[in-house]
Design a protein with these regions (language model features):
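Charge-rich, well-structured scaffold segments of protease-associated domains
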Residues: 1-28, 63, 71, 93-219
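His/Glu-based metal-binding/catalytic segments typifying zinc-dependent metallopeptidases
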Residues: 26-86, 215
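Short, conserved, surface-exposed binding loops centered on an aromatic residue
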Residues: 45-48, 90, 103-106
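M16/MPP (pitrilysin/insulinase) zinc-metallopeptidase core fold and M16-derived inactive scaffolds
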Residues: 78-96, 108
Length: 219
C-alpha cells in the first residue's frame, strides 16, 4: 500500500490491520522482453468507422534503468513524443498524412510503438514516411536545437511530475518492485544533459520493426 498526503498514520495502520492481510512473497516479474524475430508480423481488420489507423511496433532491447534508458527516452521524444517531434512535424503537418500521430516507448515490455489516424488511401505512404522518421534518427538527421528542445520538454515533464500524486506513487511502486531508489531530480537532469547525438543514434539503431497493424475504416 502507498499513501500520500495529510493523514493519520495510526488510523491508517489500524484500518489495514482490520483487513487481515498477510504478507506474501512472490517472484514478481515487471520486465518483459519478447525475443526479436526476423519474421515481420502483419495484421489488418476492417471496422465501420470513418478514420483508419496504422500502427508500427518495434522491438526495443533496452530495459528500465539500464544505460540505454535515457537515450531511448530522448530518442522517442525526438521521434513522436512531443508537438515538435518528427512524426508530428513531417508526417502530419508538412505531408498532411495523419489526423493524429505519436510514438510511445515502454521500457518494461521492450516496445516502441508508432500510431497514426489516417485516411485509408494513405496507408502505404503514411507507413513508409513514419518508418523513415526513425531511419533519420538512426542516421543522426536531427539538429542540436531539436535535441535541446526535446530535453527541455522532458525536464518540464519531470518537474511537473514532482507535484503529481499519481506520478509519485507510481515511482515509489516501481522502486519497490525493482529494488532501486529514484535518483534525485538534480542527478537525473545531469544524466539527461549527458545524452548526446551519438547516444541517440546508438539507441535508435537498436530498434527494429517487428509488427505492422492496420485498421481500415470502411464507413
Amino acid at each position: 500500500f502507498f499513501f500520500l498526503g495529510d493523514f493519520n498514520e495510526i488510523e491508517i495502520q489500524n484500518v489495514l490491520e482490520s483487513f487481515g492481510f498477510k504478507g506474501r512473497e512472490g517472484d514478481v516479474k515487471v520486465q518483459y522482453c519478447q525475443p526479436y524475430s526476423n519474421i515481420l508480423q502483419e495484421g489488418m481488420i476492417r471496422k465501420n468507422v470513418g478514420q483508419s489507423i496504422v500502427e508500427l511496433g518495434y522491438h526495443c532491447p533496452s530495459e528500465y534503468g539500464d544505460e540505454q534508458h535515457l537515450p531511448m527516452i530522448v530518442m522517442n521524444g525526438l521521434l513522436g513524443g512531443f508537438a515538435h517531434s518528427k512524426l508530428f512535424t513531417n508526417v502530419r503537418e508538412n505531408a498532411g498524412l495523419a489526423y493524429t500521430i505519436s510514438s510511445q516507448l515502454d521500457l518494461f515490455s521492450g516496445l516502441l510503438r508508432m500510431y497514426a489516424g489516417i485516411d485509408r488511401e494513405n496507408r502505404n505512404q503514411a507507413r513508409k514516411m513514419m518508418n523513415n522518421q526513425l531511419i533519420d534518427l538512426k542516421k543522426g538527421y536531427f539538429t542540436e536545437f531539436e535535441l535541446e528542445q526535446t530535453k527541455e520538454m522532458i525536464r518540464r515533464s519531470l518537474l511537473l511530475s514532482q507535484d503529481n500524486q499519481g506520478s509519485l506513487i507510481e515511482r515509489a511502486y516501481q522502486n519497490s518492485l525493482l529494488g532501486k531508489s529514484s535518483a534525485d531530480f538534480k542527478s537525473w537532469i545531469e544524466k539527461l544533459e549527458q545524452v548526446d547525438k551519438d547516444a541517440i543514434c546508438r539507441a535508435a539503431n537498436n530498434v527494429k520493426l517487428q509488427a505492422i497493424y492496420f485498421m481500415e475504416g470502411i464507413e
